[in-house]
Amino acid sequence: MKEQSFEANLKKLEKIVAQLEDEKTDLDKSAELFEEGSALAAELSAKLKTIKFKVSEIKEKQGDLFTEEINNDDE
């Protein structure tokens, strides 16, 4: 099974939240939605942490380049 994109999972989570906020959603369905939403939220959070780490690594490797660009802008 293909992994869903971050954006697709975010939209799915937004739909779940909307259903949970709907007073017509019964208790059993709410519990099921909450479990699914919690899992999606954890997955999205992990993905964001991974991307943040990758960006930090890139910036660290390219630190001299970024510093040079900033210093050249000051001149």
From Swiss-Prot:
<dbReference type="GO" id="GO:0005829">
    <property type="term" value="C:cytosol"/>
</dbReference>
<dbReference type="GO" id="GO:0009318">
    <property type="term" value="C:exodeoxyribonuclease VII complex"/>
</dbReference>
<dbReference type="InterPro" id="IPR003761">
    <property type="entry name" value="Exonuc_VII_S"/>
</dbReference>
<dbReference type="GO" id="GO:0008855">
    <property type="term" value="F:exodeoxyribonuclease VII activity"/>
</dbReference>
<protein>
    <recommendedName>
        <fullName>Exodeoxyribonuclease 7 small subunit</fullName>
        <ecNumber>3.1.11.6</ecNumber>
    </recommendedName>
</protein>
<keyword id="KW-0269">Exonuclease</keyword>
<keyword id="KW-0540">Nuclease</keyword>
<keyword id="KW-0378">Hydrolase</keyword>
<dbReference type="Pfam" id="PF02609">
    <property type="entry name" value="Exonuc_VII_S"/>
</dbReference>
<dbReference type="GO" id="GO:0006308">
    <property type="term" value="P:DNA catabolic process"/>
</dbReference>
<comment type="subunit">
    <text>Heterooligomer composed of large and small subunits.</text>
</comment>
<dbReference type="InterPro" id="IPR037004">
    <property type="entry name" value="Exonuc_VII_ssu_sf"/>
</dbReference>
<comment type="similarity">
    <text>Belongs to the XseB family.</text>
</comment>
<keyword id="KW-0963">Cytoplasm</keyword>
<comment type="function">
    <text>Bidirectionally degrades single-stranded DNA into large acid-insoluble oligonucleotides, which are then degraded further into small acid-soluble oligonucleotides.</text>
</comment>
